[in-house]
């Protein structure tokens, strides 16, 4: 009887360790960063440096007194005056349910090979209120993380 109880506990521990290994092998690791700041190929880029895909749940931007339930590109075009007039500006939207594969990079805002539009965008950003963003995403196993502009690393959300 003691051997049976020991064997059952051992099997349960093995299943738990296997499950934890599966979760880690599919974990997304999302970051948002500037690329080539101030240069002619400037971009604000979302990276998935994890081993598994990330599924976007929500994106919000907060200023001193307002929270906007919108992605970065929409915020730039709808809230920051003058952004829509910048030539050579490209953007990608982040939508709930969007899948970001492991190893993928998405330029949320980018300017290709043009210094003058880069300078114009950076001036508009510097003259705008400071923002913080919150990106909530999940793994294929429905583990959820939050990434904010104040943190360097995503934080796992408890259920």
Task: Identify the residue ranges that each predicted region occupies.
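Membrane-proximal alpha-helical anchors
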Residues: 1-73, 81-82
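An amphipathic alpha-helical interaction surface
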Residues: 39-41, 55-159
